[in-house]
Amino acid sequence: MSAEVSTNESAPPAEKKSKLTNAQKARIERNQAKAQKLREAKLVSHPFKELASNKEGGTHPEAALSQGSSVIKVQGTKYIDSGGGFLLEQPVMPTGVGPAGLNKSGEEAPPILDDAIAIPVQYEECLECGDMFADSYLFNNFGHSVCDKCRDKDERYALITRTEAKAEYLLKDCDFDKREPKLRYISRKNPHNVRWGEMKLYLHLQIHQRALEVWGSEEELVRQHEAREDKREEGKARKYNKKMKQLRMEVRSSIYTKKTHEVHEHEFGPDTYDEEEDTYTHTCITCPYSETYEKM
């Protein structure tokens, strides 16, 4: 009797299933395949929804964030890549979890993620104060191990343009670009005119050290400055004397008989006869020009 009842109860679902046409079955299969593809195309999960479900359902936040999220470790702190362009700090293990991995109720706690990417951080020692630092303006741009605090206090770490460095320390382009190690610089817009080329700013301390490498000592650099100053003064004196000479020639035309705008015509005096050579000579009256010739 009971067997008959069970067969009668199970009959209606079979009848409903048999009522589906082939077109309906094909549409159901297509919808299932489309849903499966959408599930597979979902590459990054959203930890915000998981965090909200944790608050409502009470699940462990570590286990919720471990699904479909990447963890990055920066200086010992773990961050979760949200997939939206920023990082979320990974939640800390609850205080109720013991050292053996069991919570207060004695149940096994979810494991903590340990697949973080460790980013090595190198610390440098400041040459001024001796403190260790991981990031510095001078170290990042010029490779000089000085922290930002010491850089702000000392004027030696000011910047200098390439043109000023060449004029002050008598350096050439090869001393900047080809001599090893090459001097590092930062580029900035020219404040005088934005249409001009970008300025190259160097560390003043490194420029001073490079000048000592080129000239050997500060005394030699001073001598080179004096020698170039003497040459500059000599050039100015020669230029001045040339202008003064030209001015005298223009003012005192009676001394300089050269005339630029008129053609000189000779006026010869009487002829003189040379018996030994059998030649005649006559001299210009207005200038010392003389001419010797023979008469046929």
From Swiss-Prot:
Tissue: Strongly expressed in the central nervous system and muscles.
Protein name per Swiss-Prot or TrEMBL: DNA repair protein complementing XP-A cells homolog
Disulfide bond annotation, renumbered to this chain: none
Motif extent (Nuclear localization signal): 26-47
Source organism superkingdom: Eukaryota
Sequence ranges of Polar residues compositional bias: 1-10
Any Pfam family matching the protein: XPA_N
Organism whose genome encodes this protein: Drosophila melanogaster (Fruit fly)
Stored Gene3D superfamilies: XPA C-terminal domain (3.90.530.10)
